Amino acid sequence: MTFNNKTIEELHNLLVSKEISATELTQATLENIKSREEALNSFVTIAEEQALVQAKAIDEAGIDANNVLSGIPLAVKDNISTDGILTTAASKMLYNYEPIFDATAVANAKTKGMIVVGKTNMDEFAMGGSGETSHYGATKNAWDHSKVPGGSSSGSAAAVASGQVRLSLGSDTGGSIRQPAAFNGIVGLKPTYGTVSRFGLIAFGSSLDQIGPFAPTVKENALLLNAIASEDTKDSTSAPVRIADFTSKIGQDIKGMKIALPKEYLGEGIDPEVKETILNAAKHFEKLGAIVEEVSLPHSKYGVAVYYIIASSEASSNLQRFDGIRYGYRAEDATNLDEIYVNSRSQGFGEEVKRRIMLGTFSLSSGYYDAYYKKAGQVRTLIIQDFEKVFADYDLILGPTAPSVAYDLDSLNHDPVAMYLADLLTIPVNLAGLPGISIPAGFSQGLPVGLQLIGPKYSEETIYQAAAAFEATTDYHKQQPVIFGGDN
């Protein structure tokens, strides 16, 4: 059997009853990955040997009947460290990097009995919004292989949407979980900054990065967040987990919940069919008893400019460590130390990564720091204050995840600004450190449309409550791409 139509709870029951073993489930998952991989290119590394060793150990120890994730396979984005499994960040620079430790999020998942089956493809060093900047080639959209899957967590989203795996981990710096979740018609959550440890995540923008879960349904997404969230002494920005169970409000009604709909999120640049889908979703929330009202987030229009200054500046600093000396790619044509640095970085980094390093270095340089980086920080504060004003009166914010559905592969590669604008609606959430989720809300041109719900810090359980209420009364999450197939 392929098991790709079974929910996590259904798989758990099969494992506990010993109708299947963790090894059999892992083998079936590996076959699902391999059978779809040529079409999607969603994995950089398939960790077959390591996964089967893990599965055997779990079978020998016995499935934990009280832990729904015991024996469940997990795919991990390739910028999240995995002990003994290549972690390349989809870059030539780290083509041979094999960590000797697990990221805290991965270690937490393994503690729950999850089995790492592979590392998913991504935009190089998480810099990109289409899944096309990977050194290992572009990932394809699960619904239409001529379209982008979104990025940067392209492989993690496509793998879940296509039925290669049920659950995966991604990272979100400016929308890198939510946008590919929207483009592939699945559920992706960016947690409150600090909820999931960044230890072991290859750093891009340290004040923005956050690891989060992908799943086909809201509850399964929350179950994975339960597994990975933790305070961590190895990450000074991690926070105590304030919610014992992220599924605790799932199933509760949302009567009286106040939801804000920012007028800026449905303005210029939003595809008309996407706008219509979101307005219909707002009406659906009203039918469920929520109060939906229009609000304004006046500084959100500056989000993209602020983000690309701050994120690029942080990337410029973080990526200085990759110099061809200690590990990673080293240029063979270098004859002295300066040439090792210059040639290794020039040859090891892709074009988008180099573009952002240069932008960040410029923003931090003497004479420009005040005009760019300092000013961006000041406007970031205004964006945060806009959210705080809205959340003084509302429980959640509703809007589209992306301005459009998935676009054609190679259609925006020569227009980086246009590609950057595709993150217009997700970036402000990262700048403010807030939680945000993307859930399926409809279709346009045969492609999924994502609905984004944003909450104040540490409101994940309320976000899941509203998302689950919408999911329970619609069937968008049940519709699957052709490549998904079914149980056999």
From Swiss-Prot:
Q: Which GO terms describe its cellular component?
A: glutamyl-tRNA(Gln) amidotransferase complex
One term of GO molecular function: glutaminyl-tRNA synthase (glutamine-hydrolyzing) activity
Pfam families in UniProt:
Amidase (PF01425)
Q: Where is the active site?
A: K77 (charge relay system), S152 (charge relay system), S176 (acyl-ester intermediate)
Q: Which reaction does it catalyse?
A: L-glutamyl-tRNA(Gln) + L-glutamine + ATP + H2O = L-glutaminyl-tRNA(Gln) + L-glutamate + ADP + phosphate + H(+)
Keyword Protein biosynthesis found:
yes
Keywords attached to this entry: ATP-binding, Ligase, Nucleotide-binding, Protein biosynthesis
A GO biological process of this protein is: translation
The record's top EC class is ligase
Origin, by domain of life? Bacteria
- Keyword hit for Magnesium: no
As recorded in UniProt, its EC number(s) are 6.3.5.7
The record ties this protein, via SUPFAM superfamilies, to: Amidase signature (AS) enzymes (SSF75304)
Record's family?
Belongs to the amidase family. GatA subfamily.
**Assembly state and interactors?**
Heterotrimer of A, B and C subunits.
Matching PANTHER family: GLUTAMYL-TRNA(GLN) AMIDOTRANSFERASE SUBUNIT A, TRANSAMIDASE
What the protein does comes down to: Allows the formation of correctly charged Gln-tRNA(Gln) through the transamidation of misacylated Glu-tRNA(Gln) in organisms which lack glutaminyl-tRNA synthetase. The reaction takes place in the presence of glutamine and ATP through an activated gamma-phospho-Glu-tRNA(Gln).
Name used for this protein in its record: Glutamyl-tRNA(Gln) amidotransferase subunit A
Species whose genome carries this gene: Streptococcus pneumoniae (strain 70585)
